[in-house]
Swiss-Prot record:
Lineage, highest ranks first: Bacteria, Bacillati, Actinomycetota, Actinomycetes, Propionibacteriales
Keyword flag Magnesium: no
Function text: Catalyzes the coenzyme F420-dependent oxidation of glucose 6-phosphate (G6P) to 6-phosphogluconolactone.
The reaction(s) this protein catalyses: oxidized coenzyme F420-(gamma-L-Glu)(n) + D-glucose 6-phosphate + H(+) = 6-phospho-D-glucono-1,5-lactone + reduced coenzyme F420-(gamma-L-Glu)(n)
GO MF term list: coenzyme F420 binding; glucose-6-phosphate dehydrogenase (coenzyme F420) activity; oxidoreductase activity, acting on paired donors, with incorporation or reduction of molecular oxygen
Name assigned to this protein: F420-dependent glucose-6-phosphate dehydrogenase
Amino acid sequence: MSIRIGYKASAEQFGPRDLVEYAVRAEELGLDSVTVSDHFLPWRHEGGHAPFALAWMAAVGERTNRVLIGTSVLTPTFRYNPAVIAQAFATMGLLYPGRIMLGVGTGEALNEIAVSGREWPEFKERFARLREAVDLIRDLWTKEGVSSDGPFYPTVDASIYDRPETPVKVYVAAGGPLVAKYAGRAGDGFIATSGKGMELYTEKLLPAVKEGAEKAGKTFEDVDRMLEVKVSYDRDPEAALENTRFWAPLSLTPEQKHSVDSATEMERLADELPIEQVAKRWIVASDPEQAVKQFRPYLEAGFNHFVVHGPGHDQERFLTQFTEDVVPLLRKLG
């Protein structure tokens, strides 16, 4: 099995110009993909960022020649109309053929309530919206005069006039087996995040992806299994640990984050966590073999595409050290 290794551009932590340069550097260093988070509000108020992901993708496309570029992830169901997302990604698919992917998820309150003022719906509605949105996006990429009477996104004779011959690939992010099964059935790829206990991946998520793929007449290998790996690698052990602190919000439970609708409140809750709890979500390593040892269980579970998210503020340092020390060892596993 061939391993792909990518870079996660953290739009919650850096401004757009810096993020473009990091993506360019990732390609120069031999990585295979760059993905970007799509936030309207960041995880933190102080020092936080939230540039527009789609503008960033186009800028990266102009500055690179090879890497796959995509969202990890975008919610096409609340502050966006999925028809507009279909148009945007069709355009990028023409500009950068074969290099664009659309990673989607059911969303979180932090990014959607601020622009709607509505109550955050329960999972059942969010998942229904996602399925309808993906169906509509794909219809608009492959058909003309699309009329839909769906409950959330009705269209009347809608057409996208500029679209690539080969539609953009859709990756579905999932944290539970229901959406993972949908990712296997309807997605070209599946996205998960690391650090949540191996049983989740081996007993729930990946088996569900396989089941969904088989129900759609595909094989497990037909679905790109992408894992966003939270890895704080630095040759200095103290720096490797301390670099995780900015990302303390990731260690909050889903229940703690469910209805949080401001970066200030998210930051307050996160800063109450001890560094030891914050670091639990991360592979914290200063030795290459130690880092690879913690990647190996994910590879053995069935993931084939690792997108690394380094938490520190010095991303040039992270990219250089990680690609020099760890990437060659990871490539040997594939």
